[in-house]
Amino acid sequence: MPATPPMPGYDAVAVPVLDSTLGNTDIMTRISLTFPTQLSLALLQDSWYELVRAWPILAARVRHTPSTPSGLSFLIPQPDKVKELEQRSRTSHKDQEKHIVIVDASSRSIASFHPITAKAIQSSLSRDTVSVGAAPDNADSLKMTCSNATTSLKQLLRADQAYITAHATVWSDATTIALAFSHIAGDAFSVKAIFEAWRQTIESAAPAPLQGVGVDPFITYLPPHGKNSKSEDTDKQGERDVGLPLGFFQYGFIDKVRLAWNLISDIKIKRPEKKFGQYYMYMPEEKVQALMAQARADVDALVSASDDSEKQALDTRISTFNVLLAWLLQNIHAANPKRKRMSTVMTIVNAKTRPPARHDPSDYPPHQLWGGALGVPLEPLASGDYASLPLGQLALHIRTSLTAQIDPANMQANIVTLLRHTRWAKPSGKLIFFARPNHYLSGCTEWRSTRFGELDFGAAASPPSSVKPVAIGTDMEIAVSKRNRWVIFGDMGGGVWFSGFMTDHEATHRDGFGRYQHVQ
């Protein structure tokens, strides 16, 4: 791909190297929040433009620049260009030329768009069990949450459109706001920071300009010459190459063939793509507490059955996340036909909160618009064990696996491996994979720690009041299948939201999600 010629009115800043790895460049994402009342479209629109004037990187274009380590640059508009883009956005009749699209759908109830969200708006979801509902119609969802967004990196690199766009839709009984973005924008903490800045702008004034734009938090981990790309060798009082992180394998030819066959047979024969849909689950707080009590009882029983030496070595701490993920994995695996087949689950850890070895705190920029999320595998289990082990025992398995993964040396190995093999500008061509080729595969992102449910946009209500979201939505554009991908959104509207992609058979399996209340 040829380099992009200079664009007048923009300042080029390199995309950070970790954000330019293929797991980020290949994904275009959107996140929506739904509030249980009408908010002012005018206030939402004007405050968005005010925020962009304070943080012009939100209006950045992305272009190919071979001179940067990542191969990509943000082209950040200068003040006069920001004004020009705002004027175009406000007056254009083309959604692709608008930085924020506002939709007055006040003639429609949100129930016509997403029934399970409508139940949340009405506070009528069950307090006794989990509720399950299908995602909105895809065409309607695009129209109502991201009609101005680019849908691929290829399009983004050519389009005169920002890599982050906003959307606001008012229904007769609710308001949905959304951000659509290339995943090079960062992680869930990055998106939360933008929503929070938008909220702050409505309530009082735009935040101060971002400091440290252009600082690359992981450039020192870039092989082969980055000062942190090697690990300390205490035996030889020197340095050595960083190996693969826990649970990752470098595939040879035979493994590649086996993996390709397993994926193709699943996609083309066993579970064709047309059978998949996106589903949402809402777990009320009462159910969360019941699961926590059940898991603690399971752990107590495990301790009681252990001998004295095992008891001393057994760390029985489990978190709410451990239990929620254990519950989700039990239900996901219930429909798997081969119970003895091993299963590997990838989940997320974050270098923002779990820094890698050799990390210097001054390397991290003071703003949040960069990513630190890393995908790591849990220790494999047989599919039948995931489906049938006691909840607390499975939660312990998750916690133990993640404890090993967040070791600083392993975090360093994750970052160095990603930069060595999957950088968009220079992939190695080697296949580094998180599971054996014959395993069941699934992945789950965790967003609970970002606390999206605390965002209060009540300053845009009439009269102003406290208005927090009661439902959250997401989707993504990706070149490969979305199957087996899940997210634990976190607490909102008096419960915890989940979403993922599965077949109708899996969504209604009698030993899995079929046990719960399905919302039509």
UniProtKB/Swiss-Prot annotation:
State the Gene3D superfamilies in the record.
Chloramphenicol acetyltransferase-like domain (3.30.559.10)
Pathway(s) the chain acts in? Secondary metabolite biosynthesis
Q: State the practical use.
A: MELs not only have high potential as eco-friendly biosurfactants due to their excellent surface activity, but also have attracted considerable recent interest because of thei runique properties, including self-assembly, anti-tumor and cell differentiation induction activities, and moisturizing and hair-repairing properties.
Name the domain of life: Eukaryota
Q: What is its EC number?
A: 2.3.1.-
Its induction, per UniProt? Answer: Expression is induced when cells are grown in cultures containing vegetable oil as the carbon source.
Q: Does the keyword Acyltransferase apply?
A: yes
The record's family statement is:
Belongs to the plant acyltransferase family.
| UniProt keyword list | Acyltransferase, Transferase
Q: Look at the named UniProt entry and state the broad enzyme category this protein falls under.
A: transferase
The name this protein goes by in its record: Acetyltransferase MAT1
The catalytic residues are 183 (proton acceptor), 456 (proton acceptor)
Molecular function (Gene Ontology), one example: acyltransferase activity
Q: So what does this one do?
A: Acyl-CoA-dependent acyltransferase; part of the gene cluster that mediates the biosynthesis of mannosylerythritol lipids (MELs), surface-active substances that enhance the availability of water-insoluble substrates.
